[in-house]
């Protein structure tokens, strides 16, 4: 049995083929983004673009899938690329060591034409730039809000940005997007657990 056969049994051939040929861009491969990329690789997503300018720090070891004592100081995207290819050697993986900002976000989206974008950025301005560009360009995106300090997995929710509660990052994102004329249309994952 091929390792992708179980996904095909679950989703059917047509959906499995779509996953295998999909292009997903993940911005931020630390805590949330690292686990998202791992699951995309295990699902068989054929084309992954991973963007992050950070290196592994000792403080990442307790929560980031790629962080170990051995690789402190190493580029997160290079480590993640290696991990993806260990899972699926046939995957096309482009690791870009860069921050996303207003000046380069359009270039990344136009150049790679992702079917889907996962925003796992933890800095406000780059997060807003990516979200705004994707919404205005009709590129499917989901955005991760604040997870730090939360411990109750039953409080994790999926909702439009306009419906988020109890999350300081979501509130800030909502306010900044509103100034840009965006009040809804952004799927998010957030926690209702008070910090």
Q: What name fits each language-model region?
A:
Residues 1-25:
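N-terminal charged helix/coil linker that caps or initiates catalytic domains
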Residues 32-33:
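Hydrophobic/small residue at the entry helix of a nucleotide-binding pocket
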Residues 47-88:
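Glycine-rich phosphate-binding loop and adjoining beta1-alpha1-beta2 segment
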Residues 116, 120-195:
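E1/E1-like adenylate-forming module used to activate ubiquitin-like modifiers
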């Amino acid at each position: 049995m091929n390792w992708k056969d179980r996904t095909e049994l679950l989703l059917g051939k047509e959906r499995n083929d779509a996953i295998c040929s999909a292009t997903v861009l993940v911005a931020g491969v630390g805590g949330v983004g690292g686990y998202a990329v791992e699951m995309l690789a295990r699902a068989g997503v054929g084309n992954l673009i991973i963007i992050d300018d950070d290196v592994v720090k000792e403080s990442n070891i307790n929560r980031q899938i790629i962080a170990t004592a051995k690789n402190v100081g190493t580029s997160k995207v290079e480590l993640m690329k290696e991990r993806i290819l260990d899972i699926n050697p046939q995957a096309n993986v482009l690791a870009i060591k860069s921050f996303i900002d207003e000046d380069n976000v359009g270039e990344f989206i136009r150049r790679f034409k992702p079917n889907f974008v996962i925003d796992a950025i933890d800095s406000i301005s780059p997060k807003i730039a990516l979200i705004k560009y994707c919404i205005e360009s009709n590129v499917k995106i989901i955005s991760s809000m604040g997870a730090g300090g939360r411990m109750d997995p039953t409080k994790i929710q999926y909702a439009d940005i306009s419906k988020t509660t109890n999350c300081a990052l979501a509130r800030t994102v909502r306010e900044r997007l509103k100034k840009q004329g965006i009040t809804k249309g952004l799927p998010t994952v957030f926690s209702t657990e008070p910090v």
